[in-house]
């Protein structure tokens, strides 16, 4: 628990990362203000204050009022709806712009924005990973090895998760030399689509572009958080490592493989919540673009969302 309990606003408190972060902060003794269309979905707790508002629809000045009285503001903002149709470029960036302008009117002492892995640099370069031609295929291959990630994708994105499971099955058959012609066709079609345009590419590129609103700015205290590529529900290990600007890749690049193949790292949403909560309390990464990664070897499907009944002692 922080020596001085804080009043932390969380945009998107009932979502994937936001719900875990709210639970982590409440367990540390902080007060959480949930800001979204339906923040009450998270549950009830004496130190949880829901402030319902539709960020996409209200004027900037009205949104700014929701930030009053906060020590820290964290944006875990994401699409409202499920499915691939929610993964859009422009709506996300317009909402980010609105949030930043509202924060300018009513600033907190520290603003943390949770983006995505796509803005992280390919190690040794200034190129964002999302702009590297090999990133998406390596990413899809990596998440297809994880039942936890597939279950998460099915829960959030429907058909995209279902097709990923079928792709996994086909790749397993191929590796065991039992692949049918149908399996081979599934692999070829799936990977062809990724090479043309991955269904999530626009949204991941939006996260990359969002970082440009922060980069090199020192007019307010901010921190831009990019969870590592294989970010998913999983075990809370309580341990993590930090990287600034670069995507962490493990092992050495093989001669016949691209720079990402078999080398992507990840973190559970529970451990990412710990990393963000630690930064809220310690403020070691002000004006930094950073990532966290951890051990995700225990591949067990876990809830994509938690409620306030997960707070120590329940919602009492």
Task: For each feature predicted by the language model, list its residue ranges.
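N-terminal Rossmann NAD(P)H-binding glycine-rich loop of SDR-like oxidoreductase domains
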Residues: 2-30
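Rossmann-fold scaffold of SDR-type NAD(P)-dependent oxidoreductases
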Residues: 11, 72-76, 113-114
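Conserved beta-strand positions in the Rossmann-like core of class I SAM-dependent methyltransferases
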Residues: 9, 33, 223
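A conserved pocket-lining segment of Rossmann-fold NAD(P)-dependent short-chain dehydrogenase/reductase
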Residues: 195, 241-267
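NAD(P)H-binding glycine-rich loop region in Rossmannoid oxidoreductase-like domains
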Residues: 34, 39-108
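Mid/C-terminal beta-alpha module of Rossmann-like enzyme folds, strongest
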Residues: 7, 11, 15-16, 257-316
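Glycine-/Pro-rich loop/turn segments that contact NAD(P) or position catalytic residues
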Residues: 81-236, 240
